[in-house]
């Protein structure tokens, strides 16, 4: 299984001066996510999907010897489809802006993966968000 980290977005919703994935949560959040994937020991390789929208993030990933797949940065789905066309393996796709994602969560997701199904989606409940101190604004549960 290959771990894919989406790291090429513009991050415009946060209205920041710098790239969103460089925000610190113990360390830059993109590195927090990549390290969680690595520390789970679930993947044969980890690839970060970058674009011209995130040059500083790409540089940081390269400095940390993370494999890069560069895309045009058209959009999440378009960029993801580009790399999926080149991979003949199962993948776990995550956004690079999930600093609370840890190796144990990843192990549970991979453990519940069923290769007979085309895809698996992981959602969290309002109760979980509240338990980690996050105010839920868009919950349906």
Regions found by a protein language model. Give the residues of each.
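Active-site metal-binding loops of divalent metal-dependent hydrolases
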Residues: 10, 97-98
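Active-site acidic Asp-centered loop
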Residues: 51, 94-96
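Short glycine/proline-enriched coil/turn segments at helix->beta-strand junctions
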Residues: 1, 26, 41-44, 62-66, ...
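A generic secondary-structure signal
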Residues: 36, 40, 82-86, 108, ...
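N-terminal glycine-rich phosphate-binding loop and ensuing alpha1 helix
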Residues: 1-55
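Short phosphate-binding loop-to-helix
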Residues: 56-93, 101
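Conserved core of the sugar-phosphate nucleotidyltransferase
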Residues: 101-141
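Conserved beta-strand termini and adjacent loop/short-helix elements that scaffold enzyme active sites
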Residues: 49-51, 69-72, 122
């Amino acid at each position: 299984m290959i771990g894919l980290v989406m790291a090429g977005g513009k991050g415009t919703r946060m209205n920041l001066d710098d790239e969103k994935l460089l925000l610190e949560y113990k360390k830059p959040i993109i590195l927090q996510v990549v390290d969680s994937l690595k520390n789970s020991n679930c993947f044969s390789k980890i690839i970060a999907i970058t674009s011209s929208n995130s040059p500083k993030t790409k540089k940081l990933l390269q400095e940390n010897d993370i494999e890069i797949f560069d895309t045009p940065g058209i959009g999440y789905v378009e960029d993801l489809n580009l790399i999926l066309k080149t991979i003949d393996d199962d993948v776990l796709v995550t956004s690079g802006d999930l600093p609370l994602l840890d190796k144990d969560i990843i192990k549970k997701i991979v453990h519940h993966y069923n290769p007979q199904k085309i895809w698996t989606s992981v959602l969290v409940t309002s109760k979980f968000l509240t338990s980690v101190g996050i105010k839920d604004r868009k919950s349906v549960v």
